[in-house]
């Protein structure tokens, strides 16, 4: 019973969740969690041109070249902007500001429904080119990783990555909705309860 009595006067040490690489961050208020995510039109159109430009010495598949041209024109014409184009612009806007973006999951480079095409392959020499990694001389690091089919392990790793590098947007994409079932323990025990239960942000 002595240990039980001692527990009544227990005071925890200071939480260290905002030390180290998290120095300078603070817990956001309810309203601040919505964030300011807008970009001005001029910047968006410049970024669109940069991320849809393929080097002359690179030979993409002709269909991929058409997709990239169509995406860029949708921005110029402000019409029929699809999900993949908007996603690429969002990622690029963060990268242009010096933040990192890391995307992992099964088949994320191409996109499960052949919609993303974030990784291109030269049709003559099979060299790999990632436009979001090379659109500016000074930009944040863009990583895109086709992970293996172990959702629990992969999401656990990505969650840890997000804690180690708070200035990188870390995204795990389940290939199909029910694939997230394999990672449900990580979702329940860490992602949705991390701040309250473990005093850890992500």
Question: Which residue ranges define each predicted feature?
Answer:
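Flexible, glycine-rich loop/tail regions that form catalytic "lids" or insertion modules at the edges
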Residues: 1-202
């Amino acid at each position: 019973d002595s240990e039980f009595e001692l527990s009544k006067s227990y005071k925890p040490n200071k939480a260290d969740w905002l030390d180290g690489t998290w120095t300078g961050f603070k817990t956001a208020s309810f309203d601040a969690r919505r964030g300011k995510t807008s970009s001005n039109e001029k910047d968006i159109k410049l970024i669109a041109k940069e991320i849809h430009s393929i080097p002359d010495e690179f030979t993409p598949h002709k269909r991929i070249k058409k997709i990239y041209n169509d995406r860029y024109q949708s921005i110029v014409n402000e019409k029929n902007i699809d999900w993949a184009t908007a996603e690429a612009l969002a990622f690029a806007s963060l990268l242009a500001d010096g933040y990192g973006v890391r995307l992992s999951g099964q088949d994320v480079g191409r996109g499960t429904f052949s919609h993303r095409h974030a990784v291109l392959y030269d049709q003559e020499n099979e060299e790999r080119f990632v436009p979001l990694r090379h659109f500016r001389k000074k930009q944040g690091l863009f990583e895109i990783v086709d992970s293996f089919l172990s959702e629990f392990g992969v999401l656990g790793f990505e969650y840890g990555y997000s804690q180690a590098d708070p200035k990188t947007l870390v995204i795990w994409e389940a290939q199909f909705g029910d694939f997230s079932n394999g990672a449900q323990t990580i979702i329940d025990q860490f992602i949705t309860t991390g701040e309250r239960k473990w005093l850890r942000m992500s």
